[in-house]
Amino acid sequence: MAKEKFARTKPHVNVGTIGHVDHGKTTLTAAITTVLSAKFGGAAKKYDEIDAAPEEKARGITINTAHVEYETANRHYAHVDCPGHADYVKNMITGAAQMDGAILVCSAADGPMPQTREHILLARQVGVPYVLVFMNKCDMVDDAELLELVEMELRELLSKYDFPGDDTPIIHGSALKALEGDQSEIGEPSIFRLADALDSYIPDPERAIDQPFLMPVEDVFSISGRGTVVTGRVERGIVKVGEEIEIVGIRPTVKTICTGVEMFRKLLDQGQAGDNIGALLRGTKREDVERGQVLCKPGSVKPHTHFTSEVYILSKDEGGRHTPFFNGYRPQFYFRTTDVTGSIELPEGTEMVMPGDNIAMTIKLIAPIAMEEGLRFAIREGGRTVGAGVVAKIIE
């Protein structure tokens, strides 16, 4: 059976489980891999294998995350599950595991709890585009009215944070029953219903190569007789030789023409997402471009200085600050390839931020950066990472 080959042709989607502690996220993850692998191939993962999540580092922050994969009839999924609440917060803010959609797991016996709410808010803040719900432990609730009540609460909660609560798929089931091979409605069939909902509710993500061109500037060289070469890794899209591009951020935006693309000292017709290239720019002086700017498709990204964000502040144990900070704190914000100083404004009623906290705050930079909602950044003091954040809403 040439199964492998077939798998690669399926669209790939990144998802993850979110929700309150002990509502069954890891059990559901195990149930999905077990039930779907029996039908579509792939590897079943046991609860203990997922729960013993390995450590990884993202933006200088240590996060425990378990990665599993599974297939449905139409797609290949990569799925992340985190053991602890703090890991979720860090994961979502650093974008260590970018999610095209999230499965919110909520125990039918308990209903929405504080972390249920917090994870929905985080999903909204960090720009997870789709959330669907698995109402777990339905075997523990005999009262149909109670199930309806929990479902209503969940829909209201989703709507409150600007998700389409009324249209969100909510699947009733029991991850444990499904894992045990139970064939009743809340057993294995609930996992297939969840798989169908994932396939139909989360659209195919737009591939990086199909998005508008953007390349963060890492270095600038002057090559006599040829002009100025800007190097970096293409983040998304394609740049073709002869195309007009913009240089955005730090200084006023300028337009230029890309007159050449080279990679490994060879000339190419184009550079695309994932390529490390040197782009030759027409009529641009070496001192007109600097690290921290981006090359992009004209009009696709604007420079901004003022925005709201969701940030996670490293704890002392993670090598972060030992003391809290207050309103007006002025660290550096590291966007893509460079640091920019900025000041922070805490939400009303918040006096200070302790190491280990996550919080929504407004940031004002002293120089504009090419920015979109969902852009990740690090917070640094003298080159040392003290936090991580994501742009939630641009103000100006």
Curated annotation (Swiss-Prot):
SUPFAM superfamilies: EF-Tu/eEF-1alpha/eIF2-gamma C-terminal domain, P-loop containing nucleoside triphosphate hydrolases, Translation proteins. The keyword Metal-binding applies. InterPro entries: EF-Tu_GTP-bd, EF-Tu_GTPase, EFTu-like_2, EFTU_2, G_TR_CS, P-loop_NTPase, Small_GTP-bd, T_Tr_GTP-bd_dom. GO terms for molecular function: GTP binding; GTPase activity; guanosine tetraphosphate binding; translation elongation factor activity. It is found in: Cytoplasm. Residues 136-139 are annotated as: G4. Residues 81-84 are annotated as: G3. GO terms for cellular component: cytosol. It catalyses: GTP + H2O = GDP + phosphate + H(+). Signal peptide: none annotated. It comes from the Bacteria. Residues 19-26 are annotated as: G1. GTP binds at residues 19-26, 81-85, 136-139. Mg(2+) binds at residue 26. Belongs to the TRAFAC class translation factor GTPase superfamily. Classic translation factor GTPase family. EF-Tu/EF-1A subfamily. GTP hydrolase that promotes the GTP-dependent binding of aminoacyl-tRNA to the A-site of ribosomes during protein biosynthesis. PANTHER family: ELONGATION FACTOR TU, MITOCHONDRIAL, ELONGATION FACTOR TU-RELATED. HAMAP family: EF_Tu_B. This is Elongation factor Tu. The gene is tuf1.
